[in-house]
Regions:
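Class I S-adenosyl-L-methionine-dependent methyltransferase catalytic core
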Residues: 1-67, 79-254
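Intrinsic structural disorder/low-complexity segments
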Residues: 74-76
Length: 254
């Protein structure tokens, strides 16, 4: 006999969560999904303390710091589409009754957490990205480890993305300069810079003057063709164009 976990006090049945055994299909919303990834100031500080204290002598399998990235950049991440036929964003799914019902039913069938009798919009998101793939973060700890291993003092990140490398570098107190064309990220990057430090430039990295930037290591995660389609970034017309006009010039410039 399965012993079910209690529903947390913060979840109200048929308000922000639904019961698997008797689901209501008009309850879960996109805004709930965004809200569930937000941290209180106290929890934000706890996550940052974990990031600072995480030992970086070995490249451990850890997602420390990811909750901070979800807190700040989740909404823009959810707007990013993948180059998959009929790909829908989670906002499009939860805003469409037919699609929402389809994925709620599938999440119930998948039943990833048997002991949990309820579903939230996060469960629908996790189910969808498990099936369709998802846009993911560069783990902050990976940057922390690389900087420790190579004894870096200043990081250049010409394709800054969601902020994982900023967190990794700043958790060691290192200088960090990130570059990105996605101006939609600026509002929440400004909040991150205020808390953790670092510098962000919103421009095409191929047009940046790297000679004016202090760095002794480059750690970045450039887009690969059009697999992930970001705001304010034109699509590459071909694989040849991607290498010839973007990746190779970027590597040479670094």
């Amino acid at each position: 006999m399965t012993t079910f976990s209690p529903i947390p006090d913060s979840f109200i049945v048929n308000n922000n969560c639904i019961i698997k055994s008797n689901p209501k299909y008009d309850v879960l919303t996109y805004q709930q999904l965004l809200d569930l990834k937000k941290l209180t100031p106290e929890n934000l500080k706890k996550e940052w303390d974990k990031m600072i204290k995480a030992p970086s002598d070995k490249n451990r399998r850890t997602f420390v710091g990811n909750k901070i990235l979800y807190h700040f950049q989740f909404e823009e991440l959810l707007k990013t589409k993948r180059d998959i036929k009929d790909y829908k964003t989670i906002d499009e799914i939860l805003s469409n009754k037919e699609l929402s019902k389809k994925w709620i039913d599938y999440a119930i069938k998948l039943n990833r957490n048997i002991k949990k009798p309820y579903l939230t919009s996060v469960d629908i998101f996790e189910c969808y990205r498990l099936c369709k793939g998802s846009v993911v973060f560069f783990k902050p700890f990976t940057t922390k480890y690389l900087c420790t291993h190579f004894k870096a003092t200043a990081v250049l990140d010409p394709c800054a993305g969601w902020g994982g490398r900023l967190l990794g570098a700043r958790s060691l107190g290192l200088e960090y300069t990130g570059i990105d064309t996605n101006i939609n990220l600026k509002k929440n990057y400004d909040k991150m810079l205020e808390l953790y430090g670092g510098t962000m430039l919103y421009e095409n990295c191929l047009e940046s003057d790297f000679s004016t930037i202090n760095y002794d290591i480059v750690i970045t995660s450039p887009p690969y063709l059009n697999i992930e389609q970001y705001s304010h970034m034109p699509l590459f017309q071909s694989e040849s164009d991607y290498y010839k006009d973007f990746l190779i010039p970027l590597i040479k410039q670094c």
